[in-house]
């Protein structure tokens, strides 16, 4: 008997990093690990970005599924083959109004109809959401919740966004048979804010793409170096440049570090970036600060491997994938206390208060090239993060699927 698993793929086809990376990595790991009696259907409101879809393995047991258009036809991804019988369009009398096909409305309400038609037995919400009414229709459900930052740190969100996220969170808890938390920190938050019994939550750490472990050749490093006009020595931070990421702390530590050491920040820039630039100018270190935006994923391994260390001063994260990427790239990491970053980096990374630039500078001096114990620290961290490699994570997720499917 075939097990048909549906997964929310909106972020998979739209988001290059973060939730998109989580979804693509997990799906690829599931395809490598699952038995042939598993069929995976990725449900997205549209085709999204072709370059992101192509990062998902082509596999006979995988298909992308999209909502019907107003003519009643089904759009199927031509790049990924699957069982075409699952894409039979609705008859004309079942055609849906145009408004039904908006991304939000379809993912919240309309998708359940598609799941039932396609014979989906279990649906996995990969980004903290489940459709309304799915549990009542007999489809088993599991949802991955990455973080509850909007509840822990409401100051980072607009009032209306907090209301919307809170509504989605409460609704999803009612629809979920089981919940996956990607860190123990997130698990505790779900129990605290959602009043969810612990037995309903499974802790499954997020997996990381192992391509960061691969050595980047000198030619590629030289090309990336020239493309971004990189300094000879730098520490790196990867992540959206927003208030929660606390980049100001790293900038304030720069005057306390060697003058030839620079800070390279890779990520999408939000208005907070202007505060970062202003602070760098005030401290006289603006020439040592490099903000890189629009960097393709293919350049990240070289950017990591040419750095001396990774600095991750975020005030709060659900997990902290860039820490694992940096460790796999052979870098020591300095991060901040207060959330789950110790879970991601392990005991051989260094952690400081998110409000103490002197402590951050002191920690960085302990891990720069030439520092005593640096290489041992890197090796110990690399051993620690092996637990986040894909097949182990996929096996845990498959065990959850099997637990729920056995209850049908």
Where are these regions (language model features)?
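Carbohydrate transferase catalytic cores enriched for Leloir-type hexosyltransferases
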Residues: 1-408
């Amino acid at each position: 008997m075939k097990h048909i698993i549906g997964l929310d793929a909106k972020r998979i086809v739209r988001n290059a990093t973060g939730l998109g990376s989580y979804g693509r990595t997990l799906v690829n790991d599931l395809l490598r690990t699952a038995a042939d009696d598993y069929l995976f259907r990725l449900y997205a409101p549209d085709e999204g970005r072709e370059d992101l879809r192509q990062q998902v393995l082509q596999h006979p047991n995988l298909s992308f599924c999209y909502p019907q258009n107003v003519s009643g036809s089904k759009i199927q991804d031509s790049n990924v083959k699957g069982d075409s019988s699952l894409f039979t369009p609705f008859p004309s009398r079942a055609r849906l109004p145009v408004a039904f096909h908006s991304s939000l409305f379809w993912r919240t309400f309309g998708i359940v109809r598609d799941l039932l038609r396609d014979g989906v037995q279990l649906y996995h919400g990969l980004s903290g959401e489940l459709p309304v009414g799915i549990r009542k229709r007999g489809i088993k459900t599991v949802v991955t919740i990455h973080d509850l930052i909007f509840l822990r740190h409401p100051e980072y969100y607009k009032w209306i966004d907090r209301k919307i996220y809170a509504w989605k969170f409460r609704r999803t808890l009612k629809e979920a048979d089981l919940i996956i938390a990607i860190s123990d920190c997130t698990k505790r938050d779900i129990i605290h804010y959602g009043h969810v019994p612990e037995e309903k939550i499974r802790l499954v750490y997020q997996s990381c793409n192992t391509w960061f472990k691969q050595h980047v050749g000198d030619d590629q490093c030289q090309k990336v170096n020239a493309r971004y006009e990189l300094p000879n020595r730098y520490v790196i931070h990867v992540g959206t440049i927003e208030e929660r990421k606390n980049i100001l702390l790293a900038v304030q530590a720069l005057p306390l570090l060697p003058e030839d050491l620079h800070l390279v920040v890779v990520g999408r820039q939000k208005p907070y970036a202007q505060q970062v630039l202003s602070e760098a100018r005030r401290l006289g270190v603006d020439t040592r600060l490099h903000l890189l935006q629009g960097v393709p994923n293919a350049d990240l391994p070289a950017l990591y491997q040419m750095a001396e260390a990774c600095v991750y001063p975020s005030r709060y994260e659900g997990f902290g994938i860039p820490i694992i990427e940096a460790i796999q790239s052979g870098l020591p990491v300095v991060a901040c206390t207060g959330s789950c970053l110790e879970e991601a980096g392990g005991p051989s990374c260094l952690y400081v208060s998110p409000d103490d630039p002197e402590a951050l500078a002191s920690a960085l001096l302990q891990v720069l090239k030439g520092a005593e114990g640096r290489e041992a620290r890197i090796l110990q961290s690399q051993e620690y993060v092996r637990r986040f490699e894909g097949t182990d994570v996929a096996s845990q997720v498959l065990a959850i699927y099997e637990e729920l499917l056995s209850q049908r």
